[in-house]
Amino acid sequence: MKTAIFTVVLALAVFAVLCLVVSTHAERHSKTDMEDSPMIQERKGLPPGKPCYGATQKIPCCGVCSHNNCT
């Protein structure tokens, strides 16, 4: 009986440690992904009047690229 209880407690402890490791790993990668995300770059859009080159540029216009100028 004591062996069964010990086995269950040990299994729960191992499970808790694995959850902690996975959570820390996921949090670390989510911060890295957030820094590299194109969505972050979209929010930094070019202001109106700046030259633009259509869909191939790294940082898009805040509005629309029209006649090679952001509007």
Swiss-Prot record:
Keywords: Calcium channel impairing toxin, Disulfide bond, Ion channel impairing toxin, Knottin, Neurotoxin, Secreted, Signal, Toxin, Voltage-gated calcium channel impairing toxin. Residues 1-26 form the signal peptide. Disulfide bonds join 52-65, 61-70. The keyword Chaperone does not apply. It comes from the Eukaryota. Its main location: secreted. Expressed by the venom gland. It is found in: Secreted. GO terms for cellular component: extracellular region. Residues 27-43 form a propeptide. GO terms for molecular function: calcium channel regulator activity; toxin activity. The presence of a 'disulfide through disulfide knot' structurally defines this protein as a knottin. Reversibly blocks N-type calcium channels (Cav2.2/CACNA1B) in rat dorsal root ganglion cells. Elicits no toxic symptoms in either vertebrates or invertebrates during a period of 48 hours post-injection, when it was assayed in vivo by direct injection into mice and cockroaches. Belongs to the neurotoxin 36 family. 02 subfamily. This is Hainantoxin-X-2. It comes from Cyriopagopus hainanus (Chinese bird spider). The lineage of its organism: Eukaryota, Metazoa, Ecdysozoa, Arthropoda, Chelicerata.
